[in-house]
From Swiss-Prot:
Species this protein is from: Clostridium tetani (strain Massachusetts / E88)
Compartment(s): Cytoplasm
GO biological process, one term: arginyl-tRNA aminoacylation
Similarity field: Belongs to the class-I aminoacyl-tRNA synthetase family.
Keywords: Aminoacyl-tRNA synthetase, ATP-binding, Cytoplasm, Ligase, Nucleotide-binding, Protein biosynthesis
Protein name, per record: Arginine--tRNA ligase
Top-level EC class as recorded in UniProt: ligase
SMART domains to which the protein is assigned, alphabetical: Arg_tRNA_synt_N, DALR_1
Annotated disulfide bonds: none
Entry GO CC: cytoplasm
HAMAP family, per database record: Arg_tRNA_synth
Motif ('HIGH' region): 120-130
Amino acid sequence: MNYKELISERLSSIIELPIEDIEKLIEIPPKPEMGDFAFPCFQLAKTFRKAPNMIAEELKDKFDKSNFEKVENLGPYLNFFVDKSIFSKNVIEKILEEKDKYGASNEGKGRKALIEYSSPNIAKPFHVGHLFSTAIGNALYKIFTFEGYDCERLNHLGDWGTQFGKLIAAYKRWVDEEALEKEPIKELLRIYVKFHDEAEKDPALEEEGRLHFKRLEDGEEEEVKLWKKFRELSLKEFEKVYHMLNVEFDSYAGESFYGDKMDAVVEEIDEKGLLVESNGAKVVMLEDYNMPPCIIKKSDGATIYATRDLATAIYRKKTYDFYKSIYVVGLEQSLHFKQVFTTLKLMGHDWADDCTHIGFGLVRFTDRKLSTRKGEVIFLEDLLKESVDKTLEIINEKNSELENKEETAKKIGIGAVIFTYLKNNRERDIVFSWDEMLSFDGETGPYVQYSYARGKSILRKSGEIQGDVDYSKLNSKEEFELVKTLEGFNKSILQAIEKLEPSIVTRYVIEVAKAFNKFYNHNSILNAEDEEIKKARIKLVESTCQVIKNALNLLGIEVVEKM
């Protein structure tokens, strides 16, 4: 039984409003003593020509109270107190019946969603900043898929641009082939940094780089061969990191893929009378939208990012006919995407409204900053390995007898990093702290994973439960608060979709872990006062583990069975 639906149906028969409209108005009161659900009567005042508190009183008298402990009116609110044993039975049985599917729905059935994320630059380090986009995009993919959407995971590789001319010039002068074979990205970064250092002393190098890029654009064999080599070596390295993170993609079509699709876009913009000349460049004027012009071609005739992103969006609409296209790219690109989407609208592509840029903040280390040109960069692979090593140290200190220590350290260490990136609103910067991130107390990945492992330990000791379970035995405050928290899983997922904010699911699973540990600390489970209470509590533990597992899976984090 879904109490929200039940309340909506019964109210609908009294006030003749559509069930779905009523359901949207139902709230969860801030305090348990105010009930489990509340219906505000403000919106009915106009229709009924009465004060909201009078409407609430009349509704209370007419409402069918079966399956409810009580229904009260408090000022303009109608407050509902559910029958705790019916509620607990419904929630726990639903979780244990649906298992890995609990929280899922058909919300997105028949709808195509594209999610572009990660998108690192070829021949440059996959650094800690890239994990923001990767973690958010991967979580959104899992969340959308869980709710029935047909999703495509797109990795828009930065595999084109003038930097490749510089890299080819650097390669021909300074590459160490042995080092390139061993650690490709580090060697490519070394020669790229060297190019910039040397170019400061000898500006002719910049011209050499431009020449190589021109030859690459013209399809000259040597340059194309080297560019392909850089791309393949980089992808191999990126895939190592993706494997560590359990992240996959459906497409790696990057900037180079859209190179031959831009002329048609420039032509279309011109045909629609949108292309004007400004300081020698070809632009689309956007002053009516309080934005600077969208540059389509620079004064030297070269196209830029905006042209490529316009071509990309048009190609994706033709190829996938998406319902929603999401770009997970840093906040600093906000204006760029506003310009691109506005230009698409001016071109007559109304589906531009279905394109959304979701930004994210920066990653800050108390003692280190990120910069590619000078080579001072924290490689993500190194950071993940360091997290796993530090976790292994903690395990050896706390439980050296644990089986599969290395595998467990990997799940906890990598999970802790992902959890940190997804814990707060995505637009907030992250200040990185090892002590905080790897703590088994507080709002961390290890705390949630430990809560799951604690639950699984109880279930291993209890064995299989035989016979019917009497859920009316779950009558402590902590038990009911935990059941209510478990019931809210689907709501948190749908909110995450609406706001494109995975942290809503992260915050939710923290609340589940907190409610579970509160229940665990206040109630004896394996040594409960009688067998019926024990059975009901074990089922509550089992359903809690299932919800934690489902939620962590949506965030791209694995559970740990033993700690």
